[in-house]
Each structure stands twice: as structure tokens, then as C-alpha cells.
Amino acid sequence: MSAGGRDEERRKLADIIHHWNANRLDLFEISQPTEDLEFHGVMRFYFQDKAAGNFATKCIRVSSTATTQDVIETLAEKFRPDMRMLSSPKYSLYEVHVSGERRLDIDEKPLVVQLNWNKDDREGRFVLKNENDAIPPKKAQSNGPEKQEKEGVIQNFKRTLSKKEKKEKKKREKEALRQASDKDDRPFQGEDVENSRLAAEVYKDMPETSFTRTISNPEVVMKRRRQQKLEKRMQEFRSSDGRPDSGGTLRIYADSLKPNIPYKTILLSTTDPADFAVAEALEKYGLEKENPKDYCIARVMLPPGAQHSDEKGAKEIILDDDECPLQIFREWPSDKGILVFQLKRRPPDHIPKKTKKHLEGKTPKGKERADGSGYGSTLPPEKLPYLVELSPGRRNHFAYYNYHTYEDGSDSRDKPKLYRLQLSVTEVGTEKLDDNSIQLFGPGIQPHHCDLTNMDGVVTVTPRSMDAETYVEGQRISETTMLQSGMKVQFGASHVFKFVDPSQDHALAKRSVDGGLMVKGPRHKPGIVQETTFDLGGDIHSGTALPTSKSTTRLDSDRVSSASSTAERGMVKPMIRVEQQPDYRRQESRTQDASGPELILPASIEFRESSEDSFLSAIINYTNSSTVHFKLSPTYVLYMACRYVLSNQYRPDISPTERTHKVIAVVNKMVSMMEGVIQKQKNIAGALAFWMANASELLNFIKQDRDLSRITLDAQDVLAHLVQMAFKYLVHCLQSELNNYMPAFLDDPEENSLQRPKIDDVLHTLTGAMSLLRRCRVNAALTIQLFSQLFHFINMWLFNRLVTDPDSGLCSHYWGAIIRQQLGHIEAWAEKQGLELAADCHLSRIVQATTLLTMDKYAPDDIPNINSTCFKLNSLQLQALLQNYHCAPDEPFIPTDLIENVVTVAENTADELARSDGREVQLEEDPDLQLPFLLPEDGYSCDVVRNIPNGLQEFLDPLCQRGFCRLIPHTRSPGTWTIYFEGADYESHLLRENTELAQPLRKEPEIITVTLKKQNGMGLSIVAAKGAGQDKLGIYVKSVVKGGAADVDGRLAAGDQLLSVDGRSLVGLSQERAAELMTRTSSVVTLEVAKQGAIYHGLATLLNQPSPMMQRISDRRGSGKPRPKSEGFELYNNSTQNGSPESPQLPWAEYSEPKKLPGDDRLMKNRADHRSSPNVANQPPSPGGKSAYASGTTAKITSVSTGNLCTEEQTPPPRPEAYPIPTQTYTREYFTFPASKSQDRMAPPQNQWPNYEEKPHMHTDSNHSSIAIQRVTRSQEELREDKAYQLERHRIEAAMDRKSDSDMWINQSSSLDSSTSSQEHLNHSSKSVTPASTLTKSGPGRWKTPAAIPATPVAVSQPIRTDLPPPPPPPPVHYAGDFDGMSMDLPLPPPPSANQIGLPSAQVAAAERRKREEHQRWYEKEKARLEEERERKRREQERKLGQMRTQSLNPAPFSPLTAQQMKPEKPSTLQRPQETVIRELQPQQQPRTIERRDLQYITVSKEELSSGDSLSPDPWKRDAKEKLEKQQQMHIVDMLSKEIQELQSKPDRSAEESDRLRKLMLEWQFQKRLQESKQKDEDDEEEEDDDVDTMLIMQRLEAERRARLQDEERRRQQQLEEMRKREAEDRARQEEERRRQEEERTKRDAEEKRRQEEGYYSRLEAERRRQHDEAARRLLEPEAPGLCRPPLPRDYEPPSPSPAPGAPPPPPQRNASYLKTQVLSPDSLFTAKFVAYNEEEEEEDCSLAGPNSYPGSTGAAVGAHDACRDAKEKRSKSQDADSPGSSGAPENLTFKERQRLFSQGQDVSNKVKASRKLTELENELNTK
């Protein structure tokens, strides 16, 4: 026997022994089997002393290997019956039960025989008998020839019996004689007399007592066992269909066999045939040894009122073996008399009716009406033909049946009705003529409509009148028509049925069976085989409705062939178990038209047996966890493989037992491979999480599967162990990672060391872990346990450092506050993740320790407070903390008596508690968290995943291509993966399918009109999707934001479809367009709403899922799975704050998980959605960006938040993934809607501005943006790769360095932050900066507390929509923004246009040349126009300073200012107002609160903020900034070099080209000098000095340059003079003309915009877009990152041109989600972030745009086209505001222009950076 087989045997044997031991007396316990399956136990043996007429008893220990012979020999010695050894006795061992005895064969094993009593909890005894003993009624107990030897030898030695004994002996002999005579009367009983004789004697002499029995409490045990057996049997009836009515009890009489027993009750199913009932009855009557073939059950019909014993008038019919007694009994009408069943010997002349019918040419499946009464429904129900209702026109049947609950349709539930056609006439009509009638109501149904006749296996339909509309296969009939299986029959106008005849189907499937089958064969419509026989062996005929199913036809025939193999109960995977047949109603109810579900898995898998090992190995051993898109793919594939092996499609020839063994072997193989892979990758966190998730999910599948669960117990144990093993390894990996950053908790804020880890690193590690677990879809309960371990580790590490290192000085108020503050970040993070309970619990000791360090502990009054606060600390810990406490210089000492008191109290409380729990009281925290590992009971993916999960097909594709396997989707499956689960509620599957998918088809949703009064937005999040059968996209409410207008109104709910807004239809519009329309509404909005349209259109699941196409570049969590529903609402987090104008200023930690939103409950159908950790249970969006909707509803979904829609969570910084699982780089379809536009337009939640208290210290990279764009559509996980993160991180850093964070914002936008909603953003960015003062008690006597350690904000990367054309801003908006958007120091040729991006550099250069002249003309024009515009702007500004709500006319509301990286010439003027902005934007002044901490980094130019701004003391930023600038500078020089080389290489240059070459050479030299100069100074400058010095250096360089230029000019003056004059005149003319045109167009456009946008669009917005676009195009080279800024609150207004330093700015505006739309349009590259800036800067910034300027970032390449037109129009409007000439890069300026600039003392070098150019222009204008 193989090792596996032996183990299996041993396990089974152990189970049996365990069962025995559980019910038997301790004395008779049996030992566990050894490796050789040997076991031992004590047995009691009796010895019958015939002479004495009594029994002796002994107990001996027996081995399972001991034979009867061995035992007899031992017993002969023990009982010593023949001490004198005068005889040669022959002993036998008998097994005696109350009902009889049996002699054991000589080689039987008595202990094994005894163990077999276990089977039916029998009690018995073993009796040693001397076969030579003479028994007076000789031969009465003869058991064989040997017994007749030497009778009476022992009598010679018989002692004299007493009178009493003689009497008893006589009595026994009489009894024996009587029994002998009985035996003659009842010959069939064979050895009964012999059997019962010894039994009677032994039980009479030794009656049942606790001494003589083995069972510990026989009555209870027997009762319990009977009960269990009964329950098990009942469970079988129930398990097949969930209802108990498929089985019950039946009385079986046996008057002729056992006249003294009235009857026996047996338990039967309605499908149990008569031969089964015979076997059961024989066993009950104690005749189990008889051959059941010799017996039969007869159905006896007694006249009504007759007694069972009355023979008169009784009609008896013997049942055929395949008839079902219980079914017959149940269907027997009481008025026809009494029906009883008799067990009797089968008459030798009996011919089964089946055979009779054969002779008459009838089908063996049809039944005779047995008693001639016309009733005759004796067929098992599943063999009767039936009608199953379909829904005409795909109308949902159950909607109709809700209304007909009183009908007799064989089903009380809302399911398709199914009517069995009995062997008689069945009337159809509105009248209920008899029990068999089919009662229907509806148009066209007559009282007696038609008759269905089932005779001789043929079913016909006959209309009763000409008015009775009856159709067969669509043809109206008027005369009797024969029905064939699969035909559709319609009664009246609306009742459509499918006729199904199992016997016909079976006949075709099994042509080789009896000849009678062939009678039906010809009548069967060709081509319907597959249609009607689909799944015959299980979910009967659920395939009949699918004649069109091409893909399943092969499977169908396979199933047909296996269908009749009832031995394979539940083994056939695609079919539902045969045991389900009893509930024919449920099953037939599935037989609907092609839209009806079929109870099978959503897909099945087939693999060749020969490639089984390769297949499993590919799935397990060679799966790279990082490249799998749907992380649970292995689980689903392996489960399908198990079901395949269980099915008859896998090796149809093998027996059920072999199949079972095969399944066990396959599962064991899977498990052992999984174990190997986990061991091999035990140090790789990503792989461990992946396999932990898969092992736990597979374990759940196997455990829950009703077939697999019983046969894979060993594998289940191993899998459970594997889950735990992977868990432990993963904990170890994560703790090791965490250990590297733990010193961050002890980071002294005053030291500010760059090398030391920051708390951010800890949070990043935790976030990476959470991201990893979510990406791998690890069960929420496991996630909680894992983080409990991590929190415990943090607690243990910190606590042990505190208490074990007294010299470290950590036990002080100062360090207590620091550690507590750092822990606050962890707690806030945990709360954000829904792990607050775990954090509270496992961080409690260190939290209490830090609280102790910072609280008052100087007077006796403090003792109670200390003990109540530090209740978790034991006496040793308290003592250590207090004794090691280092007092601050002016802090009082802790009194010794206080320490003693505190310790004493702890000894009586915490210490006692620990001891009572069995823990030692010790100083240090135990590194091991003493908690048992618990396997989750629920929350598995199978509860949530519907249909074939996205990514599963891709996972299998390589295997399918190599021929290992194939995946067969089952489109008509209900879509759930729990079909085969124990107790799975199939009805609910169907019900759910019907409610969600079919319901919409029965009627249209209710349409209502809702009028909302907006305050700050509608408060809706919308999503566009196309429902089943819909041609156009619909706009659906994804959720309602709390506190918003819609929420206040109360009528809108998630799932409602928005049909129109203010009379403008939204049907068929893209999400972007709909969002735009919705934002353009006035304060009163009228919406036309189809209530619950999503559900009516089959999109219910859409509402429960995050928008699928969105990807989070900046989100470390990676995507890859459909998330449970709760996550879908996560994005509305913070809605409470955002929704109300008076939101309080909450610390980060308070942004907790959103409460369930309206409609939430309805949508969250799954238990996995809301576990103890709301966020932990969440899973990222569906891989591949497609939601797991029910098949067929390929919903094109995008998710937009309109108006106030998008109160999004903040996203975590795009930093390198802590545990990246990089995925393959092929592009997946994240954008399934037209044009590659990203999904959601979002601004950060109003209250969650990124508070970059301390910027992450990262490195910058100038190419980030372009890389991000190129990577945009790759899978989310790929974007999580380290490199990507590095880039993201660089970008963020660069942004932060400039303190206006523009890079950061753009980074997300240009990365096409394709995530519509920040559902997944873990956001530990806006951590509250709990200052120490809040941690320590405020009041006198506080000692030095650490400076508020700013939470290093992990850059909040707000998802920014790049997919939308720039929609109008919400109404009154004044965007203040000093846009650093372009981090470019370029005096370069304008970048190429969008279509040139990415072209070879030669083409780029050519494109630049083509545009150059035009740009130069622009530059001169700009200045003049800007001056005119300036006055107008100022007037508008003054007017608007008092009008918050009419700010839309403010100039350049969202000016796309170019990177203001240059030092402004007048830093002081700029700096003051900006600081004012930062300091004074207090929440109470803001209608839309923006927290101060939020604003701190949303401000102004880099220089001002870095110069002395206390908010950014960090040199990292400077490094990053300088590095970025250096790279840009180098790039500029490279570009110049290229163009110079190009020009030099030309053999003959035109005069213009020569001039250009000269200028470029100068520029190149200048840039080189500038670079050298910067290089020299960059190491030792302070940030402020750096900025000032840089300006001075640049001025000096510029002066040198000016001198050089003048010399050059003098030398070339003669030859160039004329040319310059001509050029200048031409330019002036062209510019004048152009300016006139532009001004006219500006006015025209402005008017048009105002009308179009109802006052929301301002000319300034347009100007801003145009200008910024022009500036971008002019200033950015192709590599320039397209950078965006976070918007300032909308209501924020810039300070007036010369604001009073202390004047508080007006309240900020709220961030509207539409801002995100503007990200990558050329005119909106910088729109997503605004920065406070003053009016002068605004104007200066405006000047930089030119009509063809282009944001040369790769951003332009993506989705920019729609925006371009709009942008150009808007650009034109602001042309008059642009500054003349000065806006060009230096090499594009004419020499005169340069001279003029120099003469005015302006620094041409400032042109290198956009912001400096702006500053220069600003200054120039100010001085005019």
C-alpha cells in the first residue's frame, strides 16, 4: 500500500476508534493505531459452564492482530474449565447480540469484530463455548458437524445440582424445545433458534448491567446515535434542495414474515426506489442476512375506513424496484382508501410491470395507472414530463409570481413555476378543476382552456375551444398536438412554458438501454440533444433552454453520458448533485429561456490527465506572484480543477471510489506543492502574502464544498497549517522591515539628522504592508491579525527600549512627548485603515508608558490618576519607568513614596490579572504576541467575486496555449462560486440574479423630478455606465455625499439614474460631459431621476465597486481585484467635513472611515464587506479596470464627482512601494472609454489639504512627468515599481522644494492619475501635527516639549482627472495661484507640439524652427498688451475684492503660471503677502474650510517659501531643488548644443540662421557660465542667502553677458542693422494686426463664455488657460515635466496688489472635483493646484503665454485634444494682458529687447525660469 493510502486507512481507523472510545466505558477504550494499523483494547469474554448452567466472565487485553484461535487459547487458560485435563474440549468463540449469535471463524480478529459494533452502536458479548458440551435437547444448537463429537464427556465430572438449579435447568430445556418447534414453524429463519438460544441464555444469566456492557450509557448513546442517524438521513433529504419535503418516514408492515411485530418505520427519500426500501426494511426486521432480491414491497390498498388487519377488499400490487414508495404514499389521495406497504417474499411468478410494458411497446419510464383509478402517479417526480414556465420577452418571471403566491404551482417561492404532468389528463385554465389542474390567470386564458394528456409515454395538448389561444413552438393550434421535449407551449397571451420529458431526453442519451426507449427516439427533435440533456445528472435540464449554446454542446453530451450514474452523487462538477433531483421543483425552475441561470460554476476547467503534474506545477510552482493580475487566480483554477476531477467528464470510466481517491490525490498534490513554494519564498513578503491569501481561499473552497469537504480532511489540515506558516513568515518579514525604521520613533526633532529614519518610513512600511495585503486580497481577519502582530512589535520594541535602558534618558517628559506624538501618527494611520481597535489594543502599553512620562506624578493626589491611566502596566514596568525617570532642570522630582504606592496598587491589580491569565509578571514585553492564530470563518472572495474574475483568463492563457488546459465559461451560471457549498442558498442566487439583472426587464424604473438647492455643490458622485441591452451610456449616482444638497434633499440615492439636469438630457453623454453640465448649473438644479435605474439596468454591482478603470499612480496599494462594496464608498470619506461650510478643523486622525452612505446597505450584499475593519476588508478595484459585473453588462464605467462631488481621501505619496509586486508591463485596458482620458476629476477634500509640514526627503528627477505619462496605462502594480515610485517621489520632492508643490500636483495629474476616486489612497499624508503642547498638559509648570514634529506629509497625490475637457469652474471662483508649474529654467526654443512629442530630436528641432518666428513676434506683442490689460485687471480686482461670489471675472483665475523658480527681483514685496496668506487663512474665515495646515504648502514660489520660511527648514528640499535645476540647466545646454551643431553643420546659412546661431552661441556660453557659477556656490549657502546670492550672481552674469552682447553688437552692427530694422518693423506690423484680432476675439469669446456658463466662466479663466498654455509651450522643452498645482480653495482671493501685511485674505474656495479635469489639456497643465500669489505676480505670470506656446511636457500628449480648442479661445481673450517681448526665452529676444532690459536693470538670466520672467515683467510694469 502506498504511503498515502496507508495514511488514509490509518486516519479512517483512528476516526472509528475515536467514535468507539467516545461512547464506551473507559475500561474498553481502544488505543490509537500504530504505523502498521495495529491497535489494542480490553475485551470482556464470557464462558458458558454448561454443567453449572451459568456464565463466568474475564477481561483480557487483546491486539487487533490476535485471531480467534489465539484468543481461545488464552481464554482456555484463563477460565481453566478443564483443570484436570481429562477431556480434549473443542472451544468456539461466539459473538452474541440480543437478536442472536454468530460463531467467529478461527482466523477472525475478535477486537476488530468488536470495533465493528461501532457501526450501529450495537452492544454485544463474546462467549467462549465448549462445543462438546451436551445440551439436553440435543442438536438444537448444532452449529456444524464438529459439535457432535464426544457429547457428555464432561458430564462424568458434573457436580450435583441443587434443587433450584435443577428447576432452572428444566426450564431452560423447555425453552429450548419450544424454540426448536418454533424453528420448524418458520423455516425461513434458518438459524434463529440456534442464534437466539445462546443469546437468550447469556442475557438471561448475565442481564444488562454497567458490569456486563461496554457502552458507557447505552440508553443515551443509542438514543443519540439513532437521532444522529436520523438527522443525517434527514440532512441528505434537505441538502439536495434546502427543503425537508423530499424525504420522510414510511411504515413497512411484514405480517407474513414477523407476525409478532406490528410494523417498522423506515426513513426514505421521495426518490428512494422500492429495492432500497426492501433492504432498509429487512435490516429493521433483523433480516439483514437475507437476499433483498428475494423480497419485495407490495402496495396494499384498503377500502376507506378499513383496518390494516382487514384483508377484505384489499388490492395488492407489487412495486417494481424503481418505483418510489414514499412518493406514491405522499401522492395517494385519502379518499381512495388506505395505502399500506407490506414487506414480503417475492412470488416466484412475479413479472415486473416494466417488462410487461415493454411487451406492449411502452416506454419503461411511463407508468401504468396501477389500480385502474386513473391516478397512477407512481413515477418518481423527476421522471414525469413537466412544463416549466419561461418569461415571455425576457420579462422577469418572479415579478409575476410575487403576485400569484396562492397558485398551486408546486412551489411557494418566487421562482419559475413547474408543473408535473401526471399519467392522466391535466386541465389548464382559470378554474381549479382538480388537484392536478394547472390554474393560470391572465389575458386569453379560458376557464377550461385546454387539456394536457400524458398517456403511454406520449404527451398531447388539446385546446378546449376555438377561443383558447394555445401555441406550440410559436404556432397556434386548434386540435390535439403531440409535444416533444424542448418545445415551447404558450397558453393565452402571457404564459409561456417549456415542455420537458426526462424519459425522452434519457432515451436519446442512452440509446443502448431498453428497446422501449427507441419508441421515443424518432419523436425527438433532431438538434435538441444538447439543449435538453444539459446537466441531466444534476441540475436537471437547466440546459434545455439553451439550444443556441454552442460553447457548451460538447460538455452537454458529456454530461448526458454521466447523468444516470447516480452513484456519483455530487461528483459531477458542472452538474449539481444527483441528490438534488428530489427537489424537482427547484431544479426545473432553472429551465428557463436562454437568460435563465443554470446552477453551475461561472466557468469550469479541463486538463489532460497526462499533463496533470505540469498543469498543477505551472499554477503553483511557476506562478510569479508579482505578475498575476487577479491575485487569487491559483485558488480559482485549483478549485475548478478539483471540481473537474470530481465530475464525470474526467475519466468517465472510473468508479466512484476510484474517483474519490483521485480527487484526494490531486488535492494532496496541490497542497504539497503549495507548501514547497511557501517554504522556498519564505523571505519574500510579496510571495508570502500571495500564497497566504491563496492557501486560505483554497482552504475555504475545499472546506465549504459539500463534496470535497468530506474527503479532503487531511489536506484541509495541511492547508490550515500552510496559511499559518505563511502568516508567520510574513510577520517576520514585515517586522524585519519595520525594525529598520523603528529608530524613527526616537528621532529628536531638534537634531534633524538626514540619515536617520523618519516616522514617515514607518508609516510607509505599514502602508506598503497594507497595500500588499489588499492587492493580494488577503482576508480581512488575517489582515487584522497581521497588523496586530506589527503593532505589538512596535509596542514591544519601544517599550523595551524605555524600560531596559535607564541611561538613555528616554524616560523623560521630553521623550515621552516625542514618542507619544510619533505613536499618534501610527494610531491615526491605523484609524484610517480601520485598524484602530488592533492599534488601541496592541499599542496600549507603550501609549500608557508615554502618558505616564508626560503626566503629573509629583504629589499623592496623582496616584489614582496614574493607576487608572496606566492600568496595563505591571508593577515592575511602572517601577522601572518611574525610577529611571529623568527630570527636566526645573521639574520636581518624583517622590519615592509615590513610586511605592503606584507599584503597590499595580501589584494588586495588573500583576494579579496577569497571573490569573497564566502570564508571568515581567519587566519587558514579550516579543511574541501570545495570541492564537485564527483562520477566518468568512470574508472570503468567493462571497464577493461574481462570474469569471478579471485577470483569471489572462492567468490561464499561457497554459491554454500550451495545451495544458482549457477554460470553459458558463454564461448561464448564476455567477456565484458558492454553488457547491454546503447549504448554499441557490434560491437566493437566483433571486439576486433576478432582482439585479432581470427585474429591469419587467418594467421601467420610476421617474421622478428632484429640485436641489445647491450651496456648495450637489453632493453627488456619478458614474457613467452602459446597462444590459442599452445602447447609450447612462449617468448613475454612485453615492450621495453626506451634508451635500442631495443628501439634505433625501430623495436621491446610490443607484439612481440621472436622466437630465435642468432640462438637458444626460442620456448618452460621456461622464466628462455630464459632469461639465452638472457643474454649470445655477444654485437651483432640477434633475430628472430614474429611481434605482442601475438595478433595473443590471448594474447593481457597479454601485458596489470602485470605478474600475481608475488607477492610482500615486497609490502604493496597487490594484488588482474587485473590491468589496465598502471600498466603493470609501472615496466619499470626509464627506461630513466637506459637505458643510462650517467644518471644524480636524486633525488627520479624525478623518475616519465614512459611515455607510445612503443606499449603502442595499448595495452591500456581502458579508465580507463590513467586517471589523471597514477599510481592511476593502479590496482594490477590479483588475484590468473592468468591474466584476454580471456578464453581459459590459458597463463602461468612469466615475466622476461633480461640483462638490469629490470629497476624496488623500492619497499616499508616490514613494517606492515597500513591498512592490511589479506586474508585467503590457498595457491593460484601464481606459475603456473613448480617448485615453483618465477618470475622475478631483481636488483634494476641502479639509484635507496636504499639510506638508515637513516635506519628504526625496530626490528629484527632471524626467518624471514624461515617464509617468508613458507609463500611464500600464497596470497599476507596475506603476508601483520602485523606479516609478522613485520618479513619483522625485517629482513630489521637487515640487515640495519649491514649496508650491506644483510638481507634486502635476505629477499626479500628468501621471494620468487614472484613479477616479481615491478610494484606495491610504493617505497618511495629512497627519495632524499634534504639537507637543497638545500632548502634554497645558498649564503652568510644563517643561521643555519637543517642537511640534511635523508629520512628514507623505505627499498627497490627489488623483486628478485627465480625461475631461476642462469643464467650467463652479461659479464664483478666484483662483489665486503662483504657478510654479513648470520647473523649467529654460531660455529654450519652444517645445514641439503635441504630435511631435516623442519624435526624434531632428524633427523636434525642425518643429521648433518652424514655430520660432511666430513666437518671437508674440514676445514683443505681449508686453504692450499686458500693460493695457493691467489697468483693466486692477479695476476688476478692486471691484471684486468685496464681491466674493462674483470673482469669476477676476483676471487669470487659475493662471497657468510658469515655473516661478527664479528669484523674484523684489522678494520682499512678494514674500510678505504670501506669508500673510499662509498664516492668516484661518478656518473660521472660510466658508469652505481649508485648514491652516492644509495651506501651509500650497503657497507661492519656491524662493519665498524657502527663504526663511519656518515651515521648511529642511535642506533636503534645497538639494532636490538644486538637483532638478541642474538637470534642467544641463538639458537646456544640451538642447542649445544640438541646435548650434545643427546650424553649424549647414553649409550655407541664411542671414537669419546666422543671427540665430550667434545668439544661440551666446546663450550657450551664458548657460555654461551660469552653471559653473551655481556649482561653485551651491554647497554652502543657506536657503535665503542662496536665493539672494543667486539673484546677485545672475545679475553679475547678466552684466557680463550684456557687455559681451554689446561688443558683439558693435562688431556686427553694420551688417545686421538693416536686417534688424526690417525685422522689427515687420514684427511690429504683424503684432499690431494680430493684437487687434486677438482683442476682438477676446471680447467675443468672453461674451460667449459668460452666456454659456451662466456667469461661471470668467474671461480670466480663459486667459489663464491660454496664457499658461502659451507659457508652457514657450518655456518647456519636451522633457519638461508638466506640472500641476493643487488648487487653492475656490473662495480664496489673492491679496490686492499691495496688500496690508496683516490683512486676512478672504476665505478660500473649496476644491471642486472638476479641477482635475484640466490636468493634461494644454491649457490646463497647471490647473490642478493653485498657490497664493499677489496681483502683480498674477499679471506677470499671465504675460508668459503666447498663442502657440505649448506645455512641452508629455502631458500634452495625453488627452489634450479636447481641451485645446477651449484653451486657444481662452488664450486669445487674455492676449491683451500678456507682456510684450519679455516673455520669450532669452535667445528669442532681439538684441534691442535685451538692451532695453539691461538698461532697466533687469536680469536677462531670469528668463531661464518662468517665474523670474514673470517677476521681471511685473517689476518692469510696476516701474512704468
Swiss-Prot record:
Residues with PTM N6-acetyllysine: 1807
Transmembrane region(s): none
Entry keyword Chaperone: no
Dilute domain span: 668-908
PTM sites of type Phosphoserine: 216, 246, 256, 391, 424, 512, 557, 562, 589, 655, 1083, 1107, 1126, 1140, 1143, 1172-1173, 1182, 1199, 1238, 1275, 1328, 1501, 1512, 1696, 1721, 1774, 1779, 1799
Primary site of residence: other
Every PDZ domain range: 1007-1093
Signal sequence range: none
Gene Ontology cellular-component annotations: adherens junction; cell junction; cell-cell contact zone; cell-cell junction; cytosol; nuclear speck; nucleoplasm; plasma membrane
Protein name: Afadin
GO function terms (MF aspect): actin filament binding; cadherin binding; cell adhesion molecule binding; small GTPase binding
Upper taxonomic lineage: Eukaryota, Metazoa, Chordata, Craniata, Vertebrata
Organism: Homo sapiens (Human)
